[in-house]
Amino acid sequence: MANYDLLVIVINYNSKSFVGIVKKLMEGIAELTRYLNTKLLFVDNASSDGSFEEAAEHARKAGADVEAVKLTKNFGFTRAVNIAWHYARKKWSFKYLALLNNDLVIIPRNLAKLAKYLEIGRVAGVQGTIMQMHNPSLIDNCGFMIDQNGLTYPVCRGYPFDCAELYTPSYLSGACSLYRADAIAELGQPFDNRVESYYDDKHLGLRLWSKGYRLLHVPIIVAYHLGSASYSCNGRTIKGSKWFEGIVFAELAIAVNYRRFSYPIMALYIASSVLASILTMNNYVKSYIIAVKRVKNFIDETIAIRNIPKIVYIKSIAKFNRLYKGIQIKINYK
């Protein structure tokens, strides 16, 4: 039985309309192997648009250690994850489990840093700060909080990165989170098969808390998330200047992060922005310029907290703001 540090599970279903993002994810997972011995289990829910084959082949070419499995029918997201979990447990030994949506671009080095926090006491799950792909300077979420009425709130959604704090959320984002494999094994499997999608991550988080485990958000940017792309209508075309800005930002940010900055890539996006502006009458050139400017601040943002000291005790005080922007968290350390 092969041994791995990290098992990454990615579920795919008819992602042709955003397959470029899926490919970038595959490249990011391949980069993860520089920091953690990583196995990718890429599972498809019986797609009919060829996206699975295209993305799986791209993952292999990128150098990922990937096993691609196509299911006989669409089992839904949560059941597909559970199938993948049991499949992996029979074939490999792994210490950590990463659950990643297929509509995000990851920062591999930062994602790998999260693993060390799973060695702190009873911490069983951890996530970093997830940014919005359409508005890359704004947070998608820093985990989620549940209030006394059972309502859930995405922490810091719609706020800039300086909103992000080290704290213990009620549950982690299903889009990008890491767990201790032994903690998941104690639950039997990640999700409840009765929940097809959405709030599966909430249920998982509460189950871990009920077992005496803790969850943690670490304020370091780990991914840019498109959001709900897997559940969009078939044939949906993702376009628009804001979307283009997010794609350019993610591409250039990764290049800068790995000191692989390429002027041909810049030239390609410049040409694409000009052509797209002419064809769609949207200002893609402006979006390109904004993306390039934001890349200049990227390094400072991603290393905002490099060396967080060992956590002895964290007390979270949630200040609830029931607006679409989510909530901010105020932390007291003792």
What are these regions (language model features)?
Residues 170-189, 193-222:
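A short, conserved alpha-helix in the catalytic core of glycosyltransferases
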Residues 71-89:
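Glycine-rich, basic loop-to-helix element that forms the pyrophosphate-binding segment
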Residues 93-105:
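Short beta-strand-to-loop acidic/aromatic patch adjacent to the donor-nucleotide binding site
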Residues 105-146:
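Conserved donor NDP-sugar-binding/catalytic core segment of glycosyltransferases
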Residues 15-32:
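Short, well-formed alpha-helical segments that are part of the catalytic scaffolds
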Residues 147-169:
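Short, flexible, basic/aromatic active-site loop/helix in glycosyltransferases
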Residues 17, 25, 44-53, 73, ...:
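A conserved acidic beta->alpha catalytic loop
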Residues 245, 260-334:
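Non-catalytic, C-terminal membrane-associated alpha-helical segments of glycosyltransferases
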